[in-house]
Amino acid sequence: MVDVHFSDEVPPLRHLLRAGPQAQIAIEGLTYLSANLIRGIALTPTQGLARGARVIDTGQSLQVPIGEHLLGRAFNVFGDPIDGLGPLKGMKRSLHGQAVPLHQRTTGTDILVTGIKAIDLLAPLERGSKAGLFGGAGVGKTVLITEMIHNIVSRYDGVSIFCGIGERSREGEELYREMKAAGVLNNTVMVFGQMNEPPGSRFRVGHAALTMAEYFRDQAHRDVLLMIDNVFRFIQAGSEVSGLMGQLPSRVGYQPTLATELAELEERICSTAHGAITSVQAVYIPADDLTDPAAVHTFSHLSASIVLSRKRTSEGLYPAVDPLQSGSKMLTPSVVGQRHYQVAQAVRKTLAEYEDLKDIIAMLGLEELAQNERQTVYRARRLERFLTQPFFTTEQFSGIPGKMVSLDQTLTGCEAILDDKCSGLSEQALYMIGAVDEAELEHQEREAQEVEEIGQ
């Protein structure tokens, strides 16, 4: 936090101020302390700043570049390239944009297929809406969002923008290399506010990425896929800024303006007649508490919520999507169709009944259940394993080739399990596969091999 005294004209709030020997220290004015005193947040490290140092008003707010020439490049919050490929020239725009007026917004019912069974079945994503990946530390949020980037971007016609807020620099560098190797970097823009940067930088980098996304939607008339990792770090940076500003904290130590700051970011993500911005956001859940204010306020902005479970992670069920807590407003017969809706409801009902029976099984054993209850358990355990899936992004670690599964294959597999057509297959045969045909084919090959061995 920096207090600046102006002897003459005081600049408007949100103007970018410069200080330091080479004007390398960037400050954004946030509030007036008196007629001539303004308090701002440093967007760069303040090393070299001294009391009495000269401060220059740049005469404008923080701006980032816009245009087609951004594709294939990586930037920081100032729009400066950080990929070592040289500087950029061209138009710039203030990152403090306004949300699209209500009468200019459009809504649709187009589904964005991810190729991930658990998501496409239970929490389908809507084109031009927002979806959240909720989970505590180490449950696979970044892996899942990286897999979604891999699956969607490779067959996506629009522009993809990845915004890293307060996450590890190593993960950003790995993602950059992976996208370059996959040949999708030329249609992608990456913007980073790394965890070692000041809170002001992390607090504004989301707006920088959105400003670039709005250009592609409104001027280039293209659809945009905006990936944000992690929204909680944006809220956390706002909390740090609020504390430095001297504001009294609200519940659980968050800033009193949490809802307003989050809405300023989220409400800019929408569809218009020119194009759509579809956003997938990772949201860290402190202490796995879904009632945390950061999670609660984020939930209210989303059309699909994908909750990752630590319990499923401990059981080795990846992706660790909780089928009972995850959901989407798109999962209605009028949008996804009667077949998809009925299969999803049947899967949820079976898994919910199994969850209720777990305590009885733990105390009395599976043998004490009625025949129909045992059948429910067998189906649920097979469904749990069928909804696991090997990822392309973890192929180098697991040694299992990644699989992209169509929605029809997912529905067919779930129907087969619910109708007991897979009762001849072991639970393990359905674990970490793509379509159910793979398990059936492997089962047939094993039977043929056993017959051949007996014949010999």
From Swiss-Prot:
Transmembrane segments: none annotated. Keywords: ATP synthesis, ATP-binding, CF(1), Hydrogen ion transport, Ion transport, Membrane, Nucleotide-binding, Plasmid, Thylakoid, Translocase, Transport. CDD domains: ATP-synt_F1_beta_C (cd18110), F1-ATPase_beta_CD (cd01133). Its EC number is 7.1.2.2. InterPro entries: AAA+_ATPase (IPR003593), Alt_ATPase_F1_bsu (IPR017691), ATP-synt_VA_C (IPR055190), ATP_synth_F1_bsu (IPR005722), ATPase_a/bsu_AS (IPR020003), ATPase_alpha/beta_chains (IPR050053), ATPase_F1/V1/A1_a/bsu_N_sf (IPR036121), ATPase_F1/V1/A1_a/bsu_nucl-bd (IPR000194). One of its GO terms (cellular component) is proton-transporting ATP synthase complex. It is a peripheral membrane protein. SUPFAM superfamilies: C-terminal domain of alpha and beta subunits of F1 ATP synthase (SSF47917), N-terminal domain of alpha and beta subunits of F1 ATP synthase (SSF50615), P-loop containing nucleoside triphosphate hydrolases (SSF52540). The keyword Ion transport applies. It catalyses: ATP + H2O + 4 H(+)(in) = ADP + phosphate + 5 H(+)(out). It is found in: Cellular thylakoid membrane. ATP binds at G135, G136, A137, G138, V139, G140, K141, T142. Its main location: membrane. It holds the Pfam family ATP-synt_VA_C. GO terms for molecular function: ATP binding; ATP hydrolysis activity; proton-transporting ATP synthase activity, rotational mechanism; proton-transporting ATPase activity, rotational mechanism. Belongs to the ATPase alpha/beta chains family. Produces ATP from ADP in the presence of a proton gradient across the membrane. The catalytic sites are hosted primarily by the beta subunits. F-type ATPases have 2 components, CF(1) - the catalytic core - and CF(0) - the membrane proton channel. CF(1) has five subunits: alpha(3), beta(3), gamma(1), delta(1), epsilon(1). CF(0) has four main subunits: a(1), b(1), b'(1) and c(9-12). This is ATP synthase subunit beta. It comes from Acaryochloris marina (strain MBIC 11017). The lineage of its organism: Bacteria, Bacillati, Cyanobacteriota, Cyanophyceae, Acaryochloridales.
